[in-house]
């Protein structure tokens, strides 16, 4: 996902809706895929999201991502008023140590993690955003889904991947 992608913004929460009916047989693993044409803003948003997750766990990570999507003007333009809101968004997601958040967002290891997510996505057939990969962890079968598809289409791919 690219946090500056307007289509990803509309797609926020859809994969989670799709897995709900599978009761523990499917899960969502978020991977960053900031597109070059959304500039440094998309990368920086990914860094902050990752760092919020390190402080506030998965729930905080997804809360930050959803709030970023709600507030961003998208297409690399970022938040109204610039990055001044990031600390408040992070705190509302449960990451209260803003100083540690700032240090984390500048950590080369975080940038490498984002680059690794992009490389993994490309290897798996992702060429743009939004993009999903439905994988059966038992068999290793992976099925890429490109674009902001409806919940039912994701459910059908999950059913196919699970052998149902």
Name each model feature, range by range.
Residues 1, 13-17, 87-164:
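C-terminal cap of thioredoxin/glutaredoxin-like
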Residues 1-91, 124-127, 160:
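Structural alpha/beta surface segment adjacent to cysteine/selenocysteine redox centers
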């Amino acid at each position: 996902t690219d946090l500056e992608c307007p289509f990803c913004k509309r797609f926020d929460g859809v994969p989670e809706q799709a897995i709900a009916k599978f009761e523990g047989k499917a899960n969502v693993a978020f991977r960053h895929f900031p597109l070059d044409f959304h500039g440094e803003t998309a990368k920086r948003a990914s860094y902050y999201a990752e760092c919020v997750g390190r402080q506030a766990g998965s729930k905080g990570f997804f809360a930050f991502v959803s709030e970023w999507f709600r507030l961003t003007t998208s297409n690399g333009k970022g938040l109204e008023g610039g990055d001044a809101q990031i600390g408040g968004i992070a705190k509302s997601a449960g990451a209260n140590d803003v100083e540690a958040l700032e240090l984390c967002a500048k950590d080369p290891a975080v940038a490498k993690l984002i680059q690794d997510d992009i490389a993994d996505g490309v290897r798996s057939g992702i060429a743009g955003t939004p993009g999903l990969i439905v994988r059966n962890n038992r068999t290793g079968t992976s099925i890429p889904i490109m674009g902001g598809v409806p919940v039912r289409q994701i459910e059908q791919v999950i059913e196919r991947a699970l052998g149902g």
